[in-house]
Design a protein with these regions (language model features):
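Non-heme Fe(II)/2-oxoglutarate
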Residues: 1-93
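Catalytic core of non-heme Fe(II) oxygenases with the double-stranded beta-helix
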Residues: 80-198
Length: 198
């Protein structure tokens, strides 16, 4: 499910500003900070916060409350939320909470190429493209249906894709430029305050 223009320019600049402060205040590979996934692909965990330039620790919802509300409202109101469980009544479905908010950066040679990649343990995932499509080559976001059909999603800056987390999804290899995205995962456990795996 694609939501066109979910984030506007102001929202996106707030995300970039916060991610840059978190990155600047956290050494590479420090637990809970930012990590290199593969050559050409790194991510920063934003949900639990980071040390700002004034040396105060602040979380993403504290710094970007309007953006966080917009993201969560879109996910909770998505019809995919109801299809995450095989139950007929929304009242019987468990509440969803934030598992992680991640800022992803892909440069030439980077991608997420895994024919079986799913978000294990998560219920609903959103990926928002932060970069304008003309700023990179390749790097299309794809989802794979149960019958094996692959859909390439051509996204503009601020567009979001929402999908059931157990759906196979990938990012094709970036051939040039820089592709940035914001990923939000919701799960049925309590809100996560550390890295993605706790």
């Amino acid at each position: 499910m694609i939501l066109r223009g979910l984030l506007n320019e102001e929202d996106i600049e707030r995300v970039y500003s916060y991610a840059n402060e978190v990155r600047d205040g956290m050494p590479p590979d420090e637990e809970g900070g930012w990590v290199r996934c593969t050559p050409g692909h790194e991510k920063i965990f934003l949900h639990h916060g980071g040390r700002m330039r004034d040396a105060v620790w602040r979380t993403f919802p504290e710094v970007c409350p309007a953006v966080m509300s917009k993201l969560l409202d879109a996910m909770h109101s998505s019809p995919l939320r109801a299809s995450t469980w095989k139950r007929t009544s929304l009242a019987l479905q468990p509440d969803l909470h934030v598992r992680c908010v991640e800022f992803h950066k892909y440069t030439a040679g980077g991608g997420l190429i895994d024919l079986g990649h799913i978000d294990i343990g998560t219920s609903l995932t959103m990926s928002v493209q932060l970069s304008p499509p003309e700023s990179f080559q390749g790097g299309l976001f794809t989802t794979t249906a149960t019958d094996g059909h692959v859909t390439q999603h051509k996204l503009n800056r601020g567009d979001a894709v929402i999908f059931c987390s157990e759906s196979v999804h990938n990012v094709q290899t970036v051939e040039g430029g820089t592709r940035n995205s914001l990923v939000v995962e919701l799960w049925t456990s309590e809100p996560n305050r550390v890295d993605r795996f706790h």
